[in-house]
Amino acid sequence: MRRGEGPAPRRRWLLLLAVLAALCCAAAGSGGRRRAASLGEMLREVEALMEDTQHKLRNAVQEMEAEEEGAKKLSEVNFENLPPTYHNESNTETRIGNKTVQTHQEIDKVTDNRTGSTIFSETIITSIKGGENKRNHECIIDEDCETGKYCQFSTFEYKCQPCKTQHTHCSRDVECCGDQLCVWGECRKATSRGENGTICENQHDCNPGTCCAFQKELLFPVCTPLPEEGEPCHDPSNRLLNLITWELEPDGVLERCPCASGLICQPQSSHSTTSVCELSSNETRKNEKEDPLNMDEMPFISLIPRDILSDYEESSVIQEVRKELESLEDQAGVKSEHDPAHDLFLGDEI
């Protein structure tokens, strides 16, 4: 029995050793593949880095060559063949990869007619812009900035700036802190849009009694009070437009506002380019009708024609005289169809 049991355990041990050896070989092969894969990735990264460096070097060489070539082309100017007095400006652009080389050239030639001496001048300005034409822009619109800041626009860069305090110079409402508005070029509180001095873009932005007009001292339009009598005003080129009410005027920004109600814009003189607000003819007649008629100032009222006297028919004196005549006629009991005194008073010819 013991002899029969000997070979079986021996075979089991051999089988176990074989399995362990296979597992070790598999593990060794897997680790080798991992090491080979990581080494391949490193080689690829180094290769990509070398290619990027070579690309940058090529771009730098091309830019230098483009600048030299541009300078050669610009310098090939025969000043002797130019006219005695000459001026020229030119701009050229050369695309190199993802960059643009801009060259500005100015050529001047001035000849003194008395002495015959000639002065030559050549100015060359070269600049390089990236392919994406990026500038130092921290923001593009005001919403790009955090609360309490606004986007300040300039030629070369846009930056987020802190909002301005009260009575500080401004050109936009967003520049002022909190609930302030830009009024007459200063940040102020306790104002609402449409009031006197607030910034506007068209006539609908302003309250009644004001109009949207440019101000030379501010360089942007604001809601401006309508001018009164004697003040400069907006005078349309067509005189017939003076009869049109303000509601029918265009909605765009004006250089000057039209006159207030009851006034009309008239030139100061035939040679003057400035117009001022004056009382309209209807308003003048209305004021004259409201004034009591002084008989001492018009001693020859019976000689005034009827059409002129009709302007004063509604005056208090005329009304009182007419009532007296009617009262006398009623008392006499006779109402004559043709009363010479009445006709004489109304200015009929005798």
Curated annotation (Swiss-Prot):
Entry-linked CDD domains: Dkk3_Cys2, Dkk3_N_Cys1
Signal peptide, first to last residue: 1-29
Tissues showing expression: Expressed in eye lens.
Glycan attachment residues as annotated in the record: N88, N98, N113, N196, N282
Taxonomy, superkingdom: Eukaryota
Region (DKK-type Cys-1): 139-187
Entry coiled-coil feature ranges: 33-78
Keywords per UniProt: Coiled coil, Developmental protein, Disulfide bond, Glycoprotein, Secreted, Signal, Wnt signaling pathway
Chief location category: secreted
Entry function: Antagonizes canonical Wnt signaling by inhibiting LRP5/6 interaction with Wnt and by forming a ternary complex with the transmembrane protein KREMEN that promotes internalization of LRP5/6. DKKs play an important role in vertebrate development, where they locally inhibit Wnt regulated processes such as antero-posterior axial patterning, limb development, somitogenesis and eye formation. In the adult, Dkks are implicated in bone formation and bone disease, cancer and Alzheimer disease.
Name of the molecule in the record: Dickkopf-related protein 3
Species of the source: Gallus gallus (Chicken)
